[in-house]
Amino acid sequence: MPTGCEFPMIKTFENALTAADFESTVELTNFPAVFRGCASVWDAYSKWNPFNSGLDYLEERAGSVEVEAMLSRTAPVFNGDIRSHERVSLPFSDFIRFCKQHMRGKGNGSGVDAKSADLNPMCEDYRPGQIYLAQFPILNDEKEEKVLLKILRQDIQTPTFLDAKSLSSINFWMNSAEARSSTHYDPHHNLLCVVSGRKKVVLWPPSASPSLYPMPIYGEASNHSSVGLENPNLSDYPRAEHSLKQSQEITLNAGDAVFIPEGWFHQVDSDELTVAVNFWWQSNYMSNMPEHMDSYYLRRITRSLLVSKPSSTDLRHLSEHIDQSRIEMAEGGNDNIGNESIKKGLSTLHEKASLHDLDPSASQALHDLISLVHDHVNAVDTSKGLQHTSPSCSEGGEKSKFLVNAMSCLEDDRVAHLLWNLEASRLRDVLLAMALELSYLKLLVKMEIFVLVLHKIFETLEALILHMLSPIAAEVLTQKFDEIDQQTGEEDRTQFFREFYSAFDDEAAAMDIILSRKEAFAFQVCSLASLCRLRTYHKLKGEKFSASY
């Protein structure tokens, strides 16, 4: 259904296309297309249907698999921004029981909020409608160890027009109650197939970006829109008034599929008990852009922007934008999300995490961190230094200090330098040991047990993250987190991050600080790139250019 779009109507194909026809008439145009009945020939079309014993089938086939789902406190809206949702692990069988509970509730008119007595105790903190099993891999060409639902692969078929494609991933999507995704784009071509239920998809071309206000490119959710589809705040986002004129809406019933080209914004509404599968693959354009050509393409793009000869007014607006962005970053403004602590279980990681069992290099790193942090703590008023406020409400001066130092050399930042030189596995053990000991100390305090301890050991983790983490150190820390992800099994990885963040009184604030300072680092990189563009432009015109930064 059109929604006032000024672009050609999205084509609908009732019959299957050949690979050649798909590439020439659909893919190369970078325009969406709908394929009716594309998935109706799959075994999954009948076997996964929740209203035809599909839930029993899925539970029998994969019930023991530990899946990772999105938890949204603002359900039915599920926002892809990492600050707006949590990732929770639970057995697939528990999620299936959520779905069965929803069906029973709808059947007797009692609603879906009642808790089920046979659910995992970890599930007690949320309602079934707050859980969305989103983007869980059936196939992944880079991370085979994360493909835990591969047993369902035999129930689906890759459409014939994708046979020649090198698929990067196939993902499973399922929701018990109605769900809405935030508006976003993906860096891959996408074929979204509805197996059961119904989805409504609103699509915008990349040219609609100004009306959708994408989040800052230096942020962790740069592919997401800042604007809600319904009732956007036009005082904050005046161009959003025109967004629907650039969009088209389609409805996918069971068996239907839609091709969503890379870069196209889309927002998806899913009916209750909808099951879907999507295929991601790299576009021909991106496949034909080898990395050794990146610098050349970047220069060509920059040159094409310069050829447009911006007016002096444009340049002034650009400079003002940089200054305003600098101020906004200094003032914070990131909303903290409610992030209740998940009940902790025992893991083999605990056995490695004792302060006394660290290997010599890890022990030395811990000693260096303690000395470094408490040299800093002793230099400030400790009555204030160990009190935390989130970046959104902290004083601008401290945030500005971090911003100014964002691009300092790695060697000049003692925290960043120490983190950089520490192997990811040892850093994991050090952080986990500190987190577990801090949690234990807080437990003793709550129990009013007085213990003579060296508080500096336990204070180090909070002081390090909440007060000493510069932007460049946050960038290094998150890179180390990525390495830990790659080197650690699923269960231990989940346990590590659970233990690490649960050591803080405000888990969401700790995560927000790490993300905010990582984004501050990326913001400075982007700002420097903008200044370089200005400098290059003036150089081409034979003019002098100076900027205080």
Swiss-Prot record:
SMART domains linked to this entry: JmjC (SM00558)
Class of enzymatic activity (EC top level): oxidoreductase
Keywords: Iron, Metal-binding, Nucleus, Oxidoreductase
Keyword rRNA-binding part of the UniProt annotation: no
Signal peptide: none
Gene3D superfamilies: Cupin
GO CC terms of this entry: nucleus
Domain of life: Eukaryota
Keyword Nucleus in annotation: yes
Compartment list: Nucleus
EC number from the UniProt entry: 1.14.11.-
PROSITE patterns hit by this protein: JMJC
Cofactors named for this entry: Fe(2+)
Positions that bind Fe cation: H184, D186, H266
Pfam hit, one: Cupin_8
Tissues showing expression: Mostly expressed in leaves and inflorescences, and, to a lower extent, in roots, siliques and stems.
Residue ranges of every copy of the JmjC domain listed in the record: 125-296
GO molecular function, one term: metal ion binding
Cofactor binding, note field: Binds 1 Fe(2+) ion per subunit.
PANTHER family: HYPOXIA-INDUCIBLE FACTOR 1 ALPHA INHIBITOR-RELATED, LYSINE-SPECIFIC DEMETHYLASE JMJ31
Function: May function as histone H3 lysine demethylase and be involved in regulation of gene expression.
Name the UniProt record assigns to this protein: Lysine-specific demethylase JMJ31
Record organism: Arabidopsis thaliana (Mouse-ear cress)
